[in-house]
Amino acid sequence: MDHPGGHLAVVLLILVLVSMSTENNIIRWCTVSDAEEQKCLDLAGNATARNIRGHLLCVRGQSPTDCMKQIKNGTADASTMYADEIYTAGFCYGLDVAVGESYNGVDGINYYVVALARTSSSDLSLLEMHERSSCHPGMRTTVGWTVPIGFLVNTSQISVDEQCNFPHAVGDFFGYSCVPGVKDPEHDPKGNNPRNLCEACIGDENDRHICANNPRERHFGEAGALRCVAENLGDVAFVKHTTVFDNMQGKNQESWALDLELEDLKLLCPDGREANLFQHESCHLAVVPTNAVVVRLEDKCRVYKFLERVQNAFANATEGFSLFSSVNYGQPDVLFSDSTKKLLRVMGTYMSWLGPSYTTILKAFECEGTVDMLCTSAPRFFLILNFVCIYTN
Protein backbone atom coordinates (compact mmCIF):
# COMPACT_ATOMS: atom_id res chain seq x y z
CA MET A 1 0.00 0.00 0.00
CA ASP A 2 1.41 3.40 -1.05
CA HIS A 3 2.08 5.92 1.66
CA PRO A 4 -0.06 9.06 1.09
CA GLY A 5 2.76 11.24 2.37
CA GLY A 6 4.95 10.09 -0.52
CA HIS A 7 2.39 11.22 -3.12
CA LEU A 8 2.10 14.59 -1.41
CA ALA A 9 5.86 15.08 -1.47
CA VAL A 10 5.97 14.31 -5.21
CA VAL A 11 3.14 16.77 -5.92
CA LEU A 12 4.84 19.50 -3.90
CA LEU A 13 8.13 18.88 -5.71
CA ILE A 14 6.42 19.15 -9.10
CA LEU A 15 4.74 22.41 -8.07
CA VAL A 16 8.07 23.85 -6.94
CA LEU A 17 9.76 22.86 -10.20
CA VAL A 18 6.93 24.31 -12.29
CA SER A 19 7.10 27.53 -10.29
CA MET A 20 10.87 27.77 -10.76
CA SER A 21 10.55 27.08 -14.49
CA THR A 22 7.89 29.77 -14.89
CA GLU A 23 9.95 32.32 -12.97
CA ASN A 24 13.03 31.46 -15.03
CA ASN A 25 11.13 32.27 -18.24
CA ILE A 26 10.30 35.82 -17.09
CA ILE A 27 12.55 38.66 -18.24
CA ARG A 28 11.91 41.97 -16.44
CA TRP A 29 13.22 44.81 -18.60
CA CYS A 30 14.11 48.08 -16.87
CA THR A 31 13.05 51.14 -18.90
CA VAL A 32 13.87 54.79 -18.16
CA SER A 33 11.40 56.69 -20.36
CA ASP A 34 7.81 56.55 -21.59
CA ALA A 35 9.05 55.69 -25.08
CA GLU A 36 11.16 52.79 -23.80
CA GLU A 37 8.31 51.48 -21.71
CA GLN A 38 5.90 51.58 -24.65
CA LYS A 39 8.29 49.81 -27.00
CA CYS A 40 8.97 47.22 -24.29
CA LEU A 41 5.23 46.60 -23.95
CA ASP A 42 4.90 46.33 -27.73
CA LEU A 43 7.76 43.85 -27.85
CA ALA A 44 6.18 41.81 -25.06
CA GLY A 45 2.82 41.69 -26.83
CA ASN A 46 4.31 40.74 -30.19
CA ALA A 47 6.55 38.09 -28.64
CA THR A 48 3.54 36.52 -26.93
CA ALA A 49 1.53 36.63 -30.16
CA ARG A 50 4.35 34.79 -31.96
CA ASN A 51 4.56 32.18 -29.17
CA ILE A 52 8.18 33.07 -28.46
CA ARG A 53 9.37 31.19 -25.40
CA GLY A 54 9.88 33.50 -22.45
CA HIS A 55 7.70 36.19 -20.94
CA LEU A 56 8.78 39.84 -21.06
CA LEU A 57 7.68 42.22 -18.30
CA CYS A 58 8.42 45.95 -18.33
CA VAL A 59 9.46 47.72 -15.14
CA ARG A 60 10.31 51.39 -14.70
CA GLY A 61 13.57 52.82 -13.45
CA GLN A 62 14.26 56.45 -12.60
CA SER A 63 17.66 56.42 -14.30
CA PRO A 64 20.27 54.00 -15.65
CA THR A 65 21.81 53.92 -12.16
CA ASP A 66 18.43 53.02 -10.68
CA CYS A 67 18.14 50.21 -13.22
CA MET A 68 21.57 48.95 -12.17
CA LYS A 69 20.37 48.81 -8.57
CA GLN A 70 17.14 47.05 -9.54
CA ILE A 71 19.00 44.45 -11.58
CA LYS A 72 21.46 43.85 -8.75
CA ASN A 73 18.63 43.55 -6.21
CA GLY A 74 16.61 41.18 -8.39
CA THR A 75 13.61 43.43 -9.09
CA ALA A 76 14.68 43.75 -12.74
CA ASP A 77 16.70 41.49 -15.02
CA ALA A 78 17.98 43.49 -17.98
CA SER A 79 18.46 46.95 -19.48
CA THR A 80 20.32 48.40 -22.47
CA MET A 81 23.10 50.79 -21.45
CA TYR A 82 25.83 52.99 -22.92
CA ALA A 83 29.50 52.07 -22.65
CA ASP A 84 30.29 54.29 -19.65
CA GLU A 85 27.19 53.00 -17.85
CA ILE A 86 28.27 49.42 -18.52
CA TYR A 87 31.57 50.12 -16.79
CA THR A 88 29.79 51.48 -13.73
CA ALA A 89 27.31 48.57 -13.74
CA GLY A 90 30.12 46.04 -13.79
CA PHE A 91 32.58 47.72 -11.46
CA CYS A 92 30.16 49.04 -8.85
CA TYR A 93 27.25 46.61 -8.97
CA GLY A 94 28.86 43.33 -10.02
CA LEU A 95 26.75 43.09 -13.19
CA ASP A 96 27.68 41.83 -16.63
CA VAL A 97 26.43 41.98 -20.23
CA ALA A 98 24.55 39.33 -22.19
CA VAL A 99 24.47 40.78 -25.71
CA GLY A 100 25.82 43.86 -27.43
CA GLU A 101 24.69 45.84 -30.43
CA SER A 102 26.54 45.53 -33.73
CA TYR A 103 26.21 48.24 -36.35
CA ASN A 104 27.98 46.23 -39.04
CA GLY A 105 26.82 42.74 -38.10
CA VAL A 106 30.38 41.70 -37.25
CA ASP A 107 31.73 43.46 -34.15
CA GLY A 108 30.76 45.79 -31.33
CA ILE A 109 32.76 48.85 -32.37
CA ASN A 110 30.80 52.09 -32.20
CA TYR A 111 33.48 54.58 -33.21
CA TYR A 112 37.12 55.54 -32.82
CA VAL A 113 38.08 58.72 -30.99
CA VAL A 114 40.77 60.52 -32.99
CA ALA A 115 42.85 63.68 -32.68
CA LEU A 116 42.64 65.92 -35.75
CA ALA A 117 45.14 68.60 -36.71
CA ARG A 118 45.92 70.71 -39.75
CA THR A 119 48.44 69.14 -42.11
CA SER A 120 50.39 72.39 -42.08
CA SER A 121 51.07 71.99 -38.33
CA SER A 122 54.38 70.17 -38.60
CA ASP A 123 55.55 70.41 -35.00
CA LEU A 124 52.59 68.81 -33.22
CA SER A 125 52.68 65.63 -31.14
CA LEU A 126 50.09 64.16 -28.80
CA LEU A 127 52.92 63.50 -26.38
CA GLU A 128 53.85 67.19 -26.25
CA MET A 129 50.60 69.14 -26.03
CA HIS A 130 51.48 71.45 -23.13
CA GLU A 131 50.52 75.08 -23.87
CA ARG A 132 48.86 74.03 -27.14
CA SER A 133 45.25 74.89 -27.99
CA SER A 134 42.47 72.32 -28.14
CA CYS A 135 38.93 72.00 -29.47
CA HIS A 136 36.41 69.74 -27.72
CA PRO A 137 32.81 68.91 -28.78
CA GLY A 138 31.55 69.46 -25.24
CA MET A 139 32.11 69.11 -21.53
CA ARG A 140 31.77 65.61 -20.03
CA THR A 141 31.25 64.01 -23.45
CA THR A 142 32.98 60.74 -24.27
CA VAL A 143 34.63 62.12 -27.40
CA GLY A 144 35.34 65.64 -26.21
CA TRP A 145 36.31 65.11 -22.59
CA THR A 146 36.52 61.59 -21.18
CA VAL A 147 38.78 60.06 -23.82
CA PRO A 148 41.23 62.94 -24.47
CA ILE A 149 41.58 63.93 -20.82
CA GLY A 150 41.90 60.29 -19.76
CA PHE A 151 44.66 59.91 -22.35
CA LEU A 152 46.52 62.92 -20.96
CA VAL A 153 46.25 61.53 -17.42
CA ASN A 154 47.39 58.06 -18.45
CA THR A 155 50.40 59.46 -20.33
CA SER A 156 51.33 61.55 -17.26
CA GLN A 157 50.98 64.82 -19.16
CA ILE A 158 48.54 66.17 -16.59
CA SER A 159 48.18 65.36 -12.91
CA VAL A 160 45.13 65.95 -10.76
CA ASP A 161 45.11 67.40 -7.24
CA GLU A 162 43.66 65.70 -4.17
CA GLN A 163 40.25 67.22 -4.92
CA CYS A 164 40.36 65.56 -8.35
CA ASN A 165 39.72 68.89 -10.07
CA PHE A 166 40.08 67.86 -13.70
CA PRO A 167 38.99 71.20 -15.26
CA HIS A 168 41.73 73.05 -13.38
CA ALA A 169 44.32 70.48 -14.42
CA VAL A 170 43.22 70.75 -18.05
CA GLY A 171 43.19 74.55 -17.91
CA ASP A 172 46.72 74.57 -16.51
CA PHE A 173 47.87 72.21 -19.26
CA PHE A 174 46.45 73.75 -22.45
CA GLY A 175 47.21 77.30 -23.49
CA TYR A 176 43.60 77.89 -24.46
CA SER A 177 40.69 75.72 -25.55
CA CYS A 178 37.05 75.55 -26.46
CA VAL A 179 35.19 73.19 -24.14
CA PRO A 180 31.50 74.13 -24.55
CA GLY A 181 29.65 73.87 -21.26
CA VAL A 182 32.71 74.05 -19.01
CA LYS A 183 31.38 77.23 -17.35
CA ASP A 184 27.78 76.00 -17.06
CA PRO A 185 26.51 75.72 -13.44
CA GLU A 186 26.03 71.99 -13.97
CA HIS A 187 29.77 71.54 -14.51
CA ASP A 188 31.02 74.60 -12.65
CA PRO A 189 28.79 75.12 -9.59
CA LYS A 190 31.33 77.35 -7.84
CA GLY A 191 32.10 79.36 -10.97
CA ASN A 192 35.85 78.83 -10.78
CA ASN A 193 36.59 76.60 -13.78
CA PRO A 194 39.44 78.15 -15.82
CA ARG A 195 38.34 80.79 -18.32
CA ASN A 196 41.00 79.77 -20.83
CA LEU A 197 38.93 76.64 -21.52
CA CYS A 198 36.49 78.96 -23.34
CA GLU A 199 39.00 81.22 -25.13
CA ALA A 200 38.88 79.28 -28.42
CA CYS A 201 35.07 79.47 -28.48
CA ILE A 202 33.35 82.08 -30.66
CA GLY A 203 29.65 82.00 -29.70
CA ASP A 204 27.03 82.97 -32.29
CA GLU A 205 27.12 85.55 -35.09
CA ASN A 206 26.46 88.32 -32.56
CA ASP A 207 29.24 87.22 -30.20
CA ARG A 208 26.74 85.92 -27.67
CA HIS A 209 26.46 82.49 -26.04
CA ILE A 210 30.23 82.05 -26.02
CA CYS A 211 31.15 78.61 -24.64
CA ALA A 212 27.47 77.60 -24.48
CA ASN A 213 26.79 73.88 -24.32
CA ASN A 214 24.52 74.00 -27.38
CA PRO A 215 24.69 74.82 -31.12
CA ARG A 216 24.49 78.57 -30.46
CA GLU A 217 28.19 78.20 -29.75
CA ARG A 218 29.52 77.60 -33.28
CA HIS A 219 32.36 75.42 -31.98
CA PHE A 220 29.93 73.13 -30.14
CA GLY A 221 29.71 69.47 -31.09
CA GLU A 222 31.96 67.46 -33.36
CA ALA A 223 31.36 69.65 -36.41
CA GLY A 224 32.11 72.67 -34.22
CA ALA A 225 35.36 71.16 -32.95
CA LEU A 226 36.38 70.42 -36.54
CA ARG A 227 35.55 74.01 -37.48
CA CYS A 228 37.67 75.24 -34.56
CA VAL A 229 40.74 73.55 -36.06
CA ALA A 230 39.82 74.41 -39.65
CA GLU A 231 39.64 78.10 -38.76
CA ASN A 232 43.02 77.90 -37.01
CA LEU A 233 41.62 78.65 -33.55
CA GLY A 234 42.86 75.34 -32.16
CA ASP A 235 45.82 73.05 -32.78
CA VAL A 236 43.93 69.80 -32.24
CA ALA A 237 40.30 68.65 -32.23
CA PHE A 238 39.06 65.52 -30.50
CA VAL A 239 36.27 63.94 -32.58
CA LYS A 240 34.91 60.67 -33.93
CA HIS A 241 36.73 59.11 -36.86
CA THR A 242 33.67 59.79 -39.03
CA THR A 243 33.42 63.52 -38.25
CA VAL A 244 35.57 64.75 -41.13
CA PHE A 245 33.77 62.64 -43.71
CA ASP A 246 30.37 63.70 -42.34
CA ASN A 247 31.19 67.37 -42.91
CA MET A 248 33.10 67.46 -46.17
CA GLN A 249 32.56 66.96 -49.89
CA GLY A 250 29.34 68.98 -49.80
CA LYS A 251 27.71 67.27 -46.82
CA ASN A 252 28.06 70.46 -44.75
CA GLN A 253 27.15 73.59 -46.71
CA GLU A 254 28.69 76.09 -44.29
CA SER A 255 31.49 78.11 -45.86
CA TRP A 256 34.21 76.83 -43.54
CA ALA A 257 33.40 73.23 -44.50
CA LEU A 258 33.11 73.92 -48.23
CA ASP A 259 36.62 75.37 -48.23
CA LEU A 260 38.11 72.35 -46.44
CA GLU A 261 39.85 69.49 -48.27
CA LEU A 262 40.76 66.05 -46.93
CA GLU A 263 44.40 66.84 -47.60
CA ASP A 264 44.19 69.78 -45.19
CA LEU A 265 43.89 67.50 -42.14
CA LYS A 266 45.80 64.67 -40.48
CA LEU A 267 45.55 62.39 -37.46
CA LEU A 268 47.82 62.62 -34.43
CA CYS A 269 48.60 59.20 -32.96
CA PRO A 270 49.05 58.32 -29.25
CA ASP A 271 52.68 57.29 -29.82
CA GLY A 272 53.63 60.67 -31.32
CA ARG A 273 53.28 59.64 -34.95
CA GLU A 274 51.07 61.21 -37.61
CA ALA A 275 48.72 59.43 -40.02
CA ASN A 276 46.26 60.23 -42.77
CA LEU A 277 42.51 60.40 -42.15
CA PHE A 278 41.90 56.85 -43.37
CA GLN A 279 44.27 55.24 -40.84
CA HIS A 280 42.02 55.61 -37.79
CA GLU A 281 42.14 51.88 -37.00
CA SER A 282 45.84 52.18 -36.16
CA CYS A 283 45.84 55.81 -35.02
CA HIS A 284 43.23 56.58 -32.35
CA LEU A 285 42.94 57.42 -28.67
CA ALA A 286 40.28 54.83 -27.89
CA VAL A 287 37.79 52.45 -29.42
CA VAL A 288 34.36 53.16 -27.96
CA PRO A 289 32.09 50.10 -27.95
CA THR A 290 28.39 49.98 -28.74
CA ASN A 291 25.57 49.67 -26.23
CA ALA A 292 24.97 46.35 -24.52
CA VAL A 293 22.33 44.66 -22.38
CA VAL A 294 23.28 44.65 -18.70
CA VAL A 295 22.25 41.63 -16.61
CA ARG A 296 23.18 39.69 -13.49
CA LEU A 297 25.98 37.23 -14.12
CA GLU A 298 23.75 34.21 -13.59
CA ASP A 299 21.24 35.52 -16.15
CA LYS A 300 23.62 35.96 -19.09
CA CYS A 301 22.48 32.72 -20.67
CA ARG A 302 18.72 33.01 -20.37
CA VAL A 303 18.58 36.69 -21.41
CA TYR A 304 20.79 35.96 -24.41
CA LYS A 305 18.56 33.07 -25.48
CA PHE A 306 15.40 35.14 -25.16
CA LEU A 307 16.88 38.01 -27.16
CA GLU A 308 18.16 35.59 -29.78
CA ARG A 309 14.62 34.29 -30.29
CA VAL A 310 13.24 37.84 -30.37
CA GLN A 311 15.94 38.91 -32.81
CA ASN A 312 15.17 36.05 -35.17
CA ALA A 313 11.54 37.09 -35.22
CA PHE A 314 11.69 40.89 -35.34
CA ALA A 315 15.17 42.13 -36.35
CA ASN A 316 14.42 42.26 -40.07
CA ALA A 317 10.67 42.81 -39.96
CA THR A 318 9.45 44.94 -42.87
CA GLU A 319 5.98 45.43 -41.43
CA GLY A 320 4.54 45.45 -37.94
CA PHE A 321 6.86 45.54 -34.94
CA SER A 322 10.56 45.96 -35.72
CA LEU A 323 13.15 45.44 -32.98
CA PHE A 324 15.65 47.98 -34.32
CA SER A 325 13.24 50.72 -35.38
CA SER A 326 11.99 53.61 -33.24
CA VAL A 327 9.88 55.30 -35.90
CA ASN A 328 6.69 54.90 -33.86
CA TYR A 329 8.06 56.18 -30.56
CA GLY A 330 8.77 59.87 -31.15
CA GLN A 331 12.53 59.68 -30.64
CA PRO A 332 15.46 57.69 -32.00
CA ASP A 333 17.25 54.71 -30.48
CA VAL A 334 14.52 53.40 -28.19
CA LEU A 335 15.57 50.22 -26.29
CA PHE A 336 18.13 49.54 -29.03
CA SER A 337 19.99 51.83 -31.42
CA ASP A 338 18.20 52.22 -34.74
CA SER A 339 21.45 51.51 -36.57
CA THR A 340 21.77 48.05 -34.98
CA LYS A 341 22.13 45.27 -37.52
CA LYS A 342 22.47 42.40 -35.08
CA LEU A 343 22.75 41.58 -31.38
CA LEU A 344 25.98 39.77 -30.63
CA ARG A 345 26.38 37.34 -27.78
CA VAL A 346 29.02 38.43 -25.24
CA MET A 347 31.02 35.37 -24.26
CA GLY A 348 33.39 37.18 -21.91
CA THR A 349 32.91 39.76 -19.19
CA TYR A 350 31.74 43.34 -19.47
CA MET A 351 35.43 44.31 -19.54
CA SER A 352 36.02 42.24 -22.66
CA TRP A 353 33.09 43.99 -24.35
CA LEU A 354 34.36 47.46 -23.42
CA GLY A 355 37.86 46.64 -24.60
CA PRO A 356 41.24 47.56 -23.13
CA SER A 357 41.66 51.03 -24.67
CA TYR A 358 38.32 52.31 -23.39
CA THR A 359 38.53 50.80 -19.91
CA THR A 360 42.04 52.19 -19.47
CA ILE A 361 40.66 55.65 -20.26
CA LEU A 362 37.80 55.30 -17.76
CA LYS A 363 40.11 54.25 -14.95
CA ALA A 364 41.79 57.66 -15.15
CA PHE A 365 38.59 59.20 -13.76
CA GLU A 366 37.93 56.88 -10.85
CA CYS A 367 38.88 59.43 -8.22
CA GLU A 368 36.46 61.97 -9.73
CA GLY A 369 33.51 59.85 -8.69
CA THR A 370 32.70 58.55 -12.15
CA VAL A 371 33.05 55.18 -10.50
CA ASP A 372 32.82 54.67 -6.75
CA MET A 373 36.24 53.49 -5.63
CA LEU A 374 34.69 51.55 -2.77
CA CYS A 375 32.55 49.27 -4.91
CA THR A 376 33.81 45.88 -5.89
CA SER A 377 33.02 43.54 -8.72
CA ALA A 378 31.34 40.19 -8.26
CA PRO A 379 33.31 36.98 -8.94
CA ARG A 380 33.39 36.13 -12.63
CA PHE A 381 32.48 32.52 -13.37
CA PHE A 382 31.51 33.38 -16.95
CA LEU A 383 33.36 30.48 -18.57
CA ILE A 384 31.35 27.92 -16.59
CA LEU A 385 28.07 29.69 -17.31
CA ASN A 386 28.81 29.94 -21.03
CA PHE A 387 29.54 26.20 -21.11
CA VAL A 388 26.22 25.46 -19.40
CA CYS A 389 24.40 27.83 -21.77
CA ILE A 390 25.76 26.08 -24.86
CA TYR A 391 24.59 22.65 -23.73
CA THR A 392 21.14 23.57 -22.40
CA ASN A 393 17.98 24.70 -24.12
Predicted regions mapped to residue ranges:
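Long, repeat-rich segments with strong aromatic
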Residues: 238-241, 290
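Alpha-to-beta junction loops
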Residues: 72-81, 133, 231-239
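Short helix-initiation/N-cap motifs at beta->coil->alpha
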Residues: 58-69, 160-227, 231, 242-244
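A conserved helix-loop-strand patch within extracytoplasmic ligand-binding domains
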Residues: 101-176
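Ligand-binding "clamshell"
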Residues: 88-104, 247-282
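Sec-exported extracytoplasmic/periplasmic mature domains
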Residues: 72, 153-157, 230-234, 312
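Extracytoplasmic/secreted cell-surface and envelope-processing proteins
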Residues: 39, 68, 88-90, 123-126, ...
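N-terminal hydrophobic or amphipathic helices and topogenic motifs
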Residues: 2-76, 81-84, 100-110, 127, ...
